[in-house]
Amino acid sequence: MTTIPDDPLGDRMKEYEMMEAGRRALPGLPLLVRLDGKAFHTFTKGLERPFDARLQRVMDATTRHLVKECGARIGYTQSDEISLVYHHEGKAEPFLGGRFQKLTSILAATATFVFNRQLAAELPEKAERMALFDCRAWVVPSLEEAANTFLWRELDASKNSVAMAAQARLSHADLQGLSTKQQQELLFQRHGINWNDYPARCKRGAWFHRVEVVRGFTTDELDKLPPLHAARKDPDLRVCLLYTSPSPRDRTRSRMPSSA
């Protein structure tokens, strides 16, 4: 019988590592994640103001990928940020075991990769730049507080949206000390631009939720299956499909204000 030698040095080093790297989210509680673009105020210089639809499409595609491939239940994006929520009822294993460092590093790396992969098609003038995302994660005590977290981010999105629309047309001196409502009114008075006429995506961001559909195979799908696939012998076999779907509000198209 081979005796495995003790490794006190390795054991001690692993203990140090796991004191921090081993931290996990409390089971059963909603886990919130927020990713932010690093120095995007510099990265986005030269893009269309106040809103660039191409950048929005890249952010939407990145959020959709995180929801579909990384187990989040809901994803929300506005400006240069993405918010996700994870919630696993019962004994279901949370994404990456709920380990904070592993989860944040994987999500930041995934968002960075997916975002940069989209640049050549949507923003070719930025394709040579490297966009980066940071990530943080935390738990909240209830689903109600998870919903409030998203409400907070959407309210922030609307406030930022008004500011961006106003700053695209008005000077810093014009806007100094004005409330969000006052900025909105001045934009309309000076330029005839009604902020409410912007598309919902520009005013409130975009939502994606995870949808699982269990159904039988279609005839076309059965024809394409390998000869020995179990579904050929069992017509009642079900398939579980995963979709990411935008909220109904985000499917509503509205035109940009003509003078924007």
Pin down the residues of each PLM region.
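Long, charge-dense
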Residues: 90-132
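Juxtacatalytic helix/coil linker segments
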Residues: 2-31
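Hydrophobic alpha-helical segments, chiefly the membrane-spanning helices
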Residues: 254-260
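Long, highly charged amphipathic alpha-helices
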Residues: 54-65, 102, 106-114, 165
